[in-house]
Swiss-Prot record:
Its EC number is 2.8.4.3. It comes from Clostridium botulinum (strain Okra / Type B1). Keywords: 4Fe-4S, Cytoplasm, Iron, Iron-sulfur, Metal-binding, S-adenosyl-L-methionine, Transferase, tRNA processing. Its main location: cytoplasm. One of its GO terms (cellular component) is cytosol. Catalyzes the methylthiolation of N6-(dimethylallyl)adenosine (i(6)A), leading to the formation of 2-methylthio-N6-(dimethylallyl)adenosine (ms(2)i(6)A) at position 37 in tRNAs that read codons beginning with uridine. The lineage of its organism: Bacteria, Bacillati, Bacillota, Clostridia, Eubacteriales. This is tRNA-2-methylthio-N(6)-dimethylallyladenosine synthase. GO terms for molecular function: 4 iron, 4 sulfur cluster binding; metal ion binding; N6-isopentenyladenosine methylthiotransferase activity. Its cofactor is [4Fe-4S] cluster.
Amino acid sequence: MNEILNTKDINAIGEFFIETWGCQMNEEDSEKLSGMLKKEGYIRTEERENADVIIFNTCCVRENAELKVYGNLGILKGLKSKNPNLIIAVTGCMMQQKGMAETIKKKFPFVDIIIGTHNLHNFPNYLNEVKKKDTSVLKIQEKEDSIIENMPIDRKNSMKAFVTIMYGCNNFCTYCIVPYVRGRERSRTPENIEDEIKKLISEGYKEITLLGQNVNSYGKDLEPKVTFAELLERVNTIDGLERVRFMTSHPKDLTDDVIEAIAKCDKLCEQIHLPVQSGSSEILKKMNRHYDREKYLDVVSKIKKLIPNVALSTDIIVGFPGETEKDFEETLSLVKEVEYDSAFTFLYSIRKGTPAAKFEDQVPEDVKHKRFNRLVEVVNEISAKKNKAYEGKIEEVLVEGTSKNDENKLMGRTRTGKLVNFIGDKDSIGKLVNVKIIKANSFSLTGEEI
């Protein structure tokens, strides 16, 4: 495995600010950037105006994320003119797209560092280069390297942590840019994953979320091969670990042994995120999802049979090219049949460089928005019903801190991922406690510690 390059000669130490768009993988990348900079002696600030180094970690899964980057970069021009020594860096998936780095440099020439997803570990070197030579750096590494282990990481949460088990994606869904910007699938060894988790437990962490673009493909590239189910069983035996979650699962690869592992491993939470994207077999075929409606519902049926109290969540794209009213109605009926606890719903947006961008039968924007609103209404109605079923029950909650809405209350999550605001003892923060659910709200639960 490659080791991170180490530098200790950055001249003046100052403050840095990181803004992150996108998924949990991006969040963990930002934690690594923060870890590297803190190791160099920098201090993190939450105020852009105070920073000596500003880093934007970008996303390109949807157009909206890109527009936010453009808007925020425009704002930085004023900060740069006030403080010429300010160093501005842009990284992440958006920069990994073909020609994007050059576009950013042309539109925003005041940006000092532009790098992609594959050379993030060298960020301190690039920063050093800019400071020493008074130059700019534009380095996009097109091919992914082997996995970099032992990177310093500055985690935002003191009791829950992301642990990446694999990088990249081999699925090539027609709407998705991820395989082009994150590279092919590469799995970490189970030993390295276990070592990271054990270190986190020694630091007081209670809950781990195993991350990958498609965790069910884990281990196929390792020698000897290791299945995701085997990894789950190994992680479940680690002493001191209280809870394990994972995301994201691809329905085509969610095998019976994984479902069985979740059912029998006591530390694995009864929560599965299973993106369906559409309820129409015709649209799923156009998306290149490698399953149809029937296969998806079959997987859901197996999950519910083995894990009766499971909480299911999903991703749904509305307005994919060629989606008819009939296709959309099939999505609505699937949502009603599965009864998701929650769903992340998105309007389809064209991603340049993907096959779907060239599809001619694009759905009009007004139609997309009407369908989206109808879907959200159904999803919210089901979510409220699922939450209502918790009233009167006693749930195990990992207490994360005080409630955002009421500092006199505590907040945490159930094993099924439900957010609970409750009256309790502040000494319980960081612990697992039993909470009686008194009231269900649209997107959270209210309770009291018992």
